[in-house]
């Protein structure tokens, strides 16, 4: 949980939605950027266009990345990625994505934020960083196996895991929301009542929404 100053009625609905992300997706996206050591001027690739991937774009920009490459195939998510700070987008997958990103970045990105967890996404993430890059992996692994030869020969470091939420990122992200620097609440693209919670989960599973917002009461 993240303690917010004041009372709920002190804030707009949009601000409350942004606060809500600090206990989950925004903290996870920031964790990816932090463990990948994203620095001012860096080129960053973000694997994933869900709420965590979009939050990772916000985090990369917040940490000063100069170029941020999103990887979306969906117009609404690509547009939101651009609004959050993505400068480019690659819709291709697999070897085509690797080839395009390496060409765009003159040999690879400084950091790669893997926010999906599938074998294909992880494999791509290991191949699109420059030699010596860091992959920040926060996508929940769908497969226990991972090719370690590629990162070994490219001197690529891999770091990540569950976000801390209440340690190094808590005050930084809360201040960024309060100051209006970031607006991660935009990942909530549809509101549901508590009675509709099953529909809310299904809508995310069917990719009809980016993130469902369940409003318990008025």
PLM regions and their residue ranges:
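Rossmann-fold NAD(P)-binding glycine/threonine-rich loop
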Residues: 139-154, 170-173
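Adenosine-nucleotide cofactor-binding segment
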Residues: 46-49, 61-124
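Glycine-rich helix-loop-beta junction characteristic of Rossmann-like nucleotide cofactor-binding loops
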Residues: 34-39, 104-106, 127
């Amino acid at each position: 949980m993240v303690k917010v100053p004041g009372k709920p009625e002190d804030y707009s609905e949009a601000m409350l939605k942004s606060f809500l992300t600090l206990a989950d997706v925004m903290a996870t996206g920031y964790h990816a950027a932090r463990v990948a050591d994203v620095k001012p001027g860096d080129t960053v690739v973000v694997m994933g266009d869900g709420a965590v991937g979009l939050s990772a774009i916000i985090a990369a920009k917040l940490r000063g990345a100069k170029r941020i490459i999103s990887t979306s195939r969906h117009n609404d998510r690509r547009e939101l990625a651009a609004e959050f700070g993505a400068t480019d987008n690659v819709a291709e997958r697999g070897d085509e994505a690797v080839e395009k990103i390496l060409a765009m970045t003159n040999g690879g990105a400084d950091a790669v934020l893997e926010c999906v967890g599938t074998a294909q996404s992880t494999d791509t993430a290991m191949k699109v960083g420059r030699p010596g890059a860091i992959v920040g992996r926060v996508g929940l692994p769908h497969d226990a196996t991972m090719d370690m030869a590629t990162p070994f020969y490219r001197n690529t470091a891999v770091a990540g895991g569950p976000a801390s939420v209440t340690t190094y990122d808590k005050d930084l992200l809360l201040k960024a929301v309060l100051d209006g620097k970031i607006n991660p609440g935009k990942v909530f693209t549809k509101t549901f009542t508590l009675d509709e919670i099953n529909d809310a989960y299904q809508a995310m599973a069917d990719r009809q929404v980016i993130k469902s917002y369940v409003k318990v009461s008025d």
